[in-house]
Amino acid sequence: LGGRKKHKLGENNSPLSLGTMVVGSNAIPIPRVSLSLSEVHLLKIHSNPIKIKGGLSHGWLDKGIYTKAPLLHEKWLYFSYEQENYSGHLGLVHEAVWGGATETFGSQPTSSEDFFRVFFLLGGSGASTSKEQTNALGNHLGMWDLGVRIKKANYNYHVYLQHPFEDQSGARWLLNYPDGLWGLSIQSQNKKAKMTDFLVELLYTMHQSGSEEVSDSTYGWDDYYNNYLYRGGWVYEGNVIGNPMFTLGQNEIRNWPHIVNNRIMALHTGVKGFISKNVEYKMWVTYSKNYGNYHDKDRSNRRGIDYQFDSGLTQLSYRVDLTTYKWFPQKNIATTLS
């Protein structure tokens, strides 16, 4: 399968959600070729199936601030277990930006051997930068995705966590253990109820494997969605590829577009239902405290520059969508407040 196609990775598929932690619908689709494995039965435990699904993609990112556009490597693998009234899933999503060229570091290696190194998160060859040789070739990020679904009475419940990682050190779970998108979704089996769906999510990305000052410099300051080499960030065509709560911008510390805000505490709720037989509503409310990122804060303090996120910036956003089906089938009338 190839070309531009809507592509999202993550099991939090409610339209009320903030979005996934790695690949969502905030940016337009990235051109790619993909191979995927549809959900198939792997084995059975007490007559209940364990299923597996996954995929592999090769993509082409935009040139942006680079002198040559970098490449995208992507793979994902999910396991699920089902019983009559509940199921569980565990998945791993891995993304890597590699190749391309920058003004500062020049052309990056793209041989078949280099692809092998990117695939297995191995250090780079002598043709790569010193940091790539000691850590891993390319900019690596991803998430662990786990959750449980329960059917009880007239409702379906989904409890989930998407835990992000950045580079090799972040992939070790306990180093940034509090960070992630924590969620609860409740869906009524009555599709015309006054409230058919309710969702609450907590986005927390404050830890990032800790402060670099109290580490041995082999981890810390994960700086989600940013990278020293691919400094444009986890972005495609000017939009964040992952969760839209992460803010793209620039400042006098790093005077190029990058993720200026990735240390976030946000509480998000969504409600969906029917006001009447033919009028559906959706409502979202998000409250967040935003603390910028470790790197910009540290450099601002060392230069004696006021840092705009020092005390945390507060944001409260609302959105209400109304859809009528009687006179104009699936005609949307939307009201947005923020």
Residue ranges and their predicted role:
Residues L1, V33-E39, L77-Q83, L146-I150, ...:
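Residues on the lipid-exposed face of transmembrane beta-strands in outer-membrane beta-barrel proteins
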Residues L1, V40-I52, S80-H89, I150-N156, ...:
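Short loop/turn motifs that connect adjacent beta-strands in outer-membrane beta-barrel proteins
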Residues L1-H73, Y81-G99:
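Outer membrane beta-barrel
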Residues G2, G54-L56, G88-L92, Y157-L161, ...:
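Membrane-embedded beta-strand positions of outer-membrane beta-barrel proteins
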Residues K6-L9, E39, H58-G64, Q83, ...:
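Transmembrane beta-strands of outer-membrane beta-barrel pores
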Residues A27-S36, A69-K75, E82, H140-W144, ...:
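Residues that define the transmembrane beta-barrel architecture of outer-membrane proteins
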Residues L90, G100-T218:
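Long, internal scaffold/assembly segments composed of regular secondary structure
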Residues S209-S300:
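C-terminal structural cap/anchor segments
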